[in-house]
Amino acid sequence: TFQQRGLRLGSMITVGNQACLGSDDAVAALLDDDRVTAIGLFLEAVRDAQQFAEVAERAAEQGVPLVALQTGRSAAGALIANSHTGSMAGRAAAYDALFARYGVATVRTPAELVETLKLLDNGGSLRGRSIVSMSCSGGEASLVADRADDTTLRFEPFSTEHTARIESTLTELVSVSNPFDYHTFMWGDRAAMGRTFGAVMDGPHDVTMLVLDAPPRPENDPASWYVAADALADAAEATGHRAVVVATLAECINEPFRAHIIERGLTPLLGIADALVALEAAATVGQHEPAPRHAPVTAPAHTALIDEASAKRRLGALGVSVPDGRVVPAGDVVSAAAEVGYPVTLKALGLTHKSEAGAVKVGLRDEVALVAALTTMPHTDAGFLVESTVTDVVAEVLVTVRRDAPIGWLVSLGFGGVMTEVWSDITHLLAPVTADDVKGALQRLRSAPLLHGFRGRPAADIEALAELVVRLTDAVVGSDIVEVELNPVLVGASGATAVDALLIVEDHS
């Protein structure tokens, strides 16, 4: 593999286009070898999602982490994967949801894959995401903090008592924070460094990283850097705390120094960015909770698009809250509005992109406004949909459930409305889902603060939204529905209502 990063490589198996054996077969074979501590997967596609789930569950039970680098995620990459292997790589969102469901850590580059496997091989996964960074440079401390901001890792501050213990090992010229710049006053003094490192590591954090870049040539006298690594190892042994050495760049820890770090029971991680990815991946594995097996899916031969009004009637019958509405010709619009009650929303049917065509008017408060809207709206033979307008609105949310063969039923949640594509704030799950799954996914959205009372606004009824998603998903899985998109679901202070719906079903005609 040509890697020179200190990874203990036991086996390498290639399955080509998986015409005979698949990646799941290779994983199953490796799990029979009790010497295997972690398994990396470089794959373009999963041949059988249910078989993959089976071996992933087995790996989790045996405590053998899986790390996946899946290619073909872009449009160009998928085209290459298709021509190269004969199997479509599939949508990235579906694969990410599959890996997340079974606790498979994901990475994006070969370097991240190697660093993650190296960390998992030497000490296993992490129980949490709280980390400490130590360095003798404020610039390195800032660099680590900036790069970690793109991850789910947390630099939790030291408590008052913990800070006092650390300060007792330092001069008054050094201030204590996390990330921690310990300066160089103690440089080369193994005992002094060990006391400070031990005080830092004697706390509740999950792992401590020491940023250390050593001179590459013997004539540059790297002895004092070995002292720093030994001091970290001494502190780790004394406290029982997990610690790693991190180089700013991969070139900053040479082979002899890597070997020494490994001999002392530590992991040398090469490159700050790759190291943080590895730490995050180890926490993903360590915090995984077993989930029920996801529902299998088959691709339909033919599909048909159901009109919005019919789609809403079907959704209403499934228990999804939709506005009270009537489908009527132009001449009956006023009477239909009187039946559902003002304010009303008027939609011209038979058009694919209603908003762009000026075929949607929301919040019409009386007959005068309704008639004015009707006169400016395009008319079609399909007529008009007159609905009650939802006035209790805290947030607009996108909810989609679709078959994503060969993986499973993909549930997507995101920032909804006409700006969905612009914000691209979406997270994904595989069905079946629970209310807790849905609420956890919503918390991962960048727009999550809008659901919790942003700038004095009321909080959204997340319980009602989660109930809607669970009810919809349970009804769709295993049915003739191929895809249902609710955009938006209007979530109020009380309740959640789907005001627009797209429904695609199997067509057996």
Q: Where in this protein do the model-derived segments appear?
A:
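Catalytic-core regions of core metabolic enzymes
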Residues: 1-509
